[in-house]
């Protein structure tokens, strides 16, 4: 039976979304109009004409603040002469309304969640029937979550060739800037981007950190490398106000950096994310999902995902792609069917190596994704599906200040047990959190193995009371390692719903240290 150990509970509120929007409309923006006087009142004329409106103090002050990816909290302060009985109607700009009663001077607070991301015009109306008066104030606002738009895999940066930056290596403890907004068909106003970042020609060990251009560099890392290694890793990173992303070389010698885009995020309705419990779609060793046998050198396999593992209207998929048993050095490239293989790469490997990388890739019109073997000799390929993007999905990306949630080298309980797992409460009890963008790194590895990441059906209370159920060991891999290696990989992990507990499984027969950093989450409300 696997032994589970608890990691410290995360607190998304303390990590904080990267931006909270506030909106304001003062009382001076209130527009008054007189109502028809009721028949039989002293104010009514024989012809039923409108009266001059009473309650000259009637007005509204509107303030709103984003509370979630889709949600806002509206505060309406009702200004009025004393003694009035007031009715307030809230039109949210999406075809829905609410209404309340209010007293003069009262501040009414309401929360609202929009089904789709975007810009809305909220209209609030306060009516004083007794004085035949009505006031309207309007408040334009927008949601803060970001939806995903797939982008044909494209190389935006290659310091070896001068693509996207001056030709030449990135010097020690320096950054390369990658233009995102306005580059090619990428629009202005992009909030975040999915990039496959690769380091190569490294003379010494180090790490790479991706962060918004012009922003403060976090203490977390996105990929780690050793001398002579070529290492890729997927990053989902906010775009700076200048429209760029910075890639920092944390080595004491120069390196070459490569960045390939596969999609971007904006605050307009597009495709939301739905995480899944990882499922294996392809394993060429056994013939699952593809012909049995290695993918030939310079060969391609098509993987049917749309209509099988993900809905037929999925626009992109989140995968973990693994090369194993390669006969020579090379790379794998994932791309949508119906297109030519691009000059990008997703997984880089050495002969005999087993190596995985997270991939976000657009889906072809036929629901397929192609995987190209860029080596001149064969390799086996494994593809695990961990999620998808679609117009029907409501999971909007919310970046957080990057934070380290776990480092077993420093937490006092030692490394991960052989064949054991660590359970981590990230958003237990919170409604609407669908999944998380995490970076996992193993280090101080003693034996070959792999890491699996999966949602947990047990609650923290069950673990603390000793009543947890035994879990089925997952088989899908997030990253693979050999003895002595430090290996990172991004994972878009499912929350398992309101439970919000994620498990990290050591699939090795020896100990390993684990580091987990968080970069954001997907929210459905």
Q: Could you tell me what each predicted segment is?
A:
Residues 1-67, 73-84, 89-92, 102-525:
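Short edge beta-strands and adjacent beta->alpha junctions
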Residues 94-98:
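Short, solvent-exposed loop/linker segments at beta-strand-coil boundaries, enriched for Pro/Gly
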């Amino acid at each position: 039976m696997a032994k589970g150990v608890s990691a410290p509970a995360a607190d998304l509120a303390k990590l904080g979304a990267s931006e909270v929007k506030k909106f304001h409309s003062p009382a001076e923006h209130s527009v008054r109009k007189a109502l028809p006087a009721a028949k039989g009142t002293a104010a009514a004329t024989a012809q039923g004409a409108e009266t001059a409106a009473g309650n000259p103090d009637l007005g509204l002050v509107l303030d709103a603040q984003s509370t979630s990816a889709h949600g806002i909290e509206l505060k309406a302060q009702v200004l009025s002469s004393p003694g009035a009985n007031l009715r307030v109607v809230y039109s949210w700009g999406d075809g829905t309304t609410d209404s309340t009663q209010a007293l003069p001077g009262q501040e009414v607070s309401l929360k609202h969640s929009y089904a789709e991301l975007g810009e809305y015009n909220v209209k609030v109306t306060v009516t004083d029937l007794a004085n035949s008066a009505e006031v309207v104030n309007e408040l334009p606002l927008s949601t803060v979550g970001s939806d995903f738009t797939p982008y044909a895999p494209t190389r935006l940066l290659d310091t070896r060739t001068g693509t996207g930056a001056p030709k030449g290596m990135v010097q020690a403890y320096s950054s390369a800037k990658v233009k995102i907004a306005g580059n090619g068909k990428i629009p202005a106003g992009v909030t975040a981007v999915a990039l496959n970042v690769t380091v190569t020609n490294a003379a010494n060990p180090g790490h790479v950190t991706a962060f918004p251009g012009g922003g403060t560099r976090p203490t977390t890392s996105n990929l780690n490398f050793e001398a002579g290694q070529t290492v890729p890793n997927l990053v989902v990173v906010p775009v700076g106000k200048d429209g760029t992303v910075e890639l920092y070389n944390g080595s004491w010698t120069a390196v070459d950096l490569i960045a390939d885009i596969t999609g971007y995020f904006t605050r307009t309705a597009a495709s939301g994310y739905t995480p899944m419990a990882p499922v294996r779609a392809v394993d060429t060793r056994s013939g699952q999902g593809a012909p049995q046998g290695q993918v030939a050198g310079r060969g391609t396999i098509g993987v049917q995902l749309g209509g099988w593992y993900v809905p037929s209207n999925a626009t992109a998929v989140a995968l973990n792609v693994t090369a194993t048993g390669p006969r020579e050095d090379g790379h794998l490239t994932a791309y949508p069917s119906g297109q030519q293989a691009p000059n990008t790469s997703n997984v880089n490997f050495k002969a005999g190596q087993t190596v995985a990388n997270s991939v976000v890739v657009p889906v072809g019109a036929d629901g397929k994704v192609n995987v190209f073997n860029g080596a001149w000799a064969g390799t086996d390929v494994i593809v695990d599906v961990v999620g998808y993007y679609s117009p029907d999905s409501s999971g909007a990306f919310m970046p957080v200040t990057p934070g380290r949630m776990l480092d077993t080298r420093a937490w006092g309980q030692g490394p991960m047990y052989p064949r054991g797992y660590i359970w981590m409460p990230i958003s237990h009890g919170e409604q609407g959190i669908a999944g998380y963008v995490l970076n996992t790194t193993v280090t101080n590895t003693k034996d070959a193995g792999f890491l699996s990441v999966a949602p947990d059906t047990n609650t923290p209370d069950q673990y603390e009371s000793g009543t947890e159920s035994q879990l089925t060991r997952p088989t899908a891999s997030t990253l693979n390692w050999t003895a002595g290696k430090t290996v990172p990989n991004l994972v878009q992990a499912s929350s398992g719903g309101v439970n919000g507990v994620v498990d990290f499984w050591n699939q090795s027969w020896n100990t390993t240290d684990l580091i987990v950093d968080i970069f954001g989450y997907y929210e459905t409300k």
